[in-house]
From Swiss-Prot:
It comes from Bradyrhizobium diazoefficiens (strain JCM 10833 / BCRC 13528 / IAM 13628 / NBRC 14792 / USDA 110). It comes from the Bacteria. GO terms for cellular component: cytoplasm. Belongs to the MnmA/TRMU family. CDD domains: MnmA_TRMU-like. GO terms for molecular function: ATP binding; tRNA binding; tRNA-uridine 2-sulfurtransferase activity. This is tRNA-specific 2-thiouridylase MnmA. Gene3D superfamilies: Adenine nucleotide alpha hydrolases-like domains, HUPs, Translation factors. The active site is at 113 (nucleophile), 210 (cysteine persulfide intermediate). Catalyzes the 2-thiolation of uridine at the wobble position (U34) of tRNA, leading to the formation of s(2)U34. GO terms for biological process: tRNA wobble position uridine thiolation.
């Protein structure tokens, strides 16, 4: 008989490691599992410790958050460990973040953190502790199939859904992970935290880039990859120089504000050319892309991705975390994959993720995804014809 986590055995005989960041979500996750009788072990990762960040509202995995996680664990009466992952985090996440901006991309550090720190290194530690599962406070859900494997689905709370940031989770990792908050709303989580008497019940949510102490990501870029802040030209689609900029890392595709140039009509960043330090701008209609080339594709749709695609697989894709899934076709084989957007999308930026879903809304299944490498404005009439790239990473 399976318990509430779809695992064999009674809760009291089932050890679960909970990744505790010190926030309300992971704290409530630990409290829920403890209340259900599981053998809960809390682990908090020390990822960075900028002096300015440790007491900032919304900081994560440093300073005050570690103390909050320790206090919650003490109240729940569960073992709690703090692991120093600063070196791993710097190498896998912060350096990657800076490199991506230097290439003219707009990275999503949370994806890399989940992929390389939480769901690889921490998962390994959980296994070494004899845990049958690793639970997190993410707003996403998983469902058990008849064969025992699991599928990733969107959270019940669409406003909090974090599936975009978890597309790179492997099937092996997914089978070991549990997301107890996936069918709850944020207000319900906070109310539960109050019932459990957790001091973090009304704590502010974490920020998008937890390791940026001042809120200015360019400070990190300037320190780690100063060449990304070298000045260069702002040009139009025909290459005419319209002005100068103070570093491509200050811009992202689709940006309108802060260009510092005068024009009769609104201009937007269409692409960033890192090799020659050029920011290319154009009218809004130049932003719409219809074809996306992907790298590092992760498939969660079951079976072999090439077999699933065949001559083309219809799906829905999200090209930014704040966007709604849009109809698209996935094509390709042998590690080379492209997305054809039925209606096109604006602001498609290299470095962002393109996440696959089987439905446009509700608790849709996550089929995987990849990182955007380049994009083109029009779909070629001949599939074998090379892309004329409009956006290049």
């Amino acid at each position: 008989m399976l318990n509430s986590l779809d695992l064999e055995g009674r809760p009291q005989d089932t050890r679960v490691v909970v990744a505790m960041s010190g926030g309300v979500d992971s704290s409530t996750t630990a409290a829920l599992l403890k209340a259900e009788g599981y053998d809960v072990v809390g682990i908090t990762l020390q990822l960075y410790d900028h002096g300015a960040a440790t007491h900032r509202k919304g900081a994560c995995c440093a300073g005050q958050d570690i103390h909050d996680a320790r206090d919650v664990a003490a109240k729940l009466g569960i073992p709690h460990y703090v692991l120093d992952y600063e070196d791993r985090f710097r190498e896998s996440v912060i350096d990657n973040f800076a490199d991506s901006y230097a290439l003219g991309e707009t990275p999503v550090p949370c994806i890399e953190c989940n992929r390389s720190i939480k769901f690889r290194d921490l998962l390994k530690t959980a296994r070494e502790l004899g845990a049958q599962a690793l639970a997190t406070g993410h707003y996403v859900a998983s469902r058990r199939l008849d064969d025992g494997s699991r599928v990733l689905v969107c959270a019940a709370d669409a406003d909090r859904d974090q599936s975009y940031f978890l597309f790179a989770t492997t099937q092996e990792q997914l089978d070991y992970l549990r997301f107890p908050l996936g069918d709850m709303t944020k207000p319900e989580t906070r109310e539960l935290a109050r019932r459990f008497g957790l001091a973090v019940a009304d704590k502010h949510d974490s920020q998008d880039i937890c390791f940026v102490p001042t809120g200015r990501y360019t400070d990190i870029i300037t320190r780690l990859r100063p060449n990304a802040m070298d000045p260069g030209d702002i040009v139009d689609l025909d290459g005419r120089v319209l002005g100068r900029h103070n570093g491509i890392a200050n811009f992202t595709v689709g940006q309108r504000r802060g260009l510092g140039i005068a024009a009769h009509a609104p201009l937007f960043v269409v692409r960033l050319e890192a090799a020659n330090r050029r920011v290319v701008v154009g009218p809004r209609e130049a932003l719409k892309m219809h074809r996306i080339s992907l790298r590092d594709v992760n498939w969660l749709g079951g079976g072999d991705i090439d077999s699933a695609i065949g001559n083309g697989l219809e799906m829905f894709v999200r090209v930014r975390s704040t966007r709604s899934p849009q109809p698209a076709w996935l094509r390709g084989a042998g590690g080379h994959y492209e997305i054809e957007l039925v209606a096109g999308e604006e602001g498609v930026s290299p470095g962002q993720a393109c996440v696959f879903y089987d439905a446009p809304s509700g608790q849709a299944r996550v089929l995987g995804g990849g990182f955007i490498q380049s994009a083109a404005a029009k779909v070629a009439s001949n599939p074998a014809r090379p892309l004329v790239e409009a956006v290049r990473g």
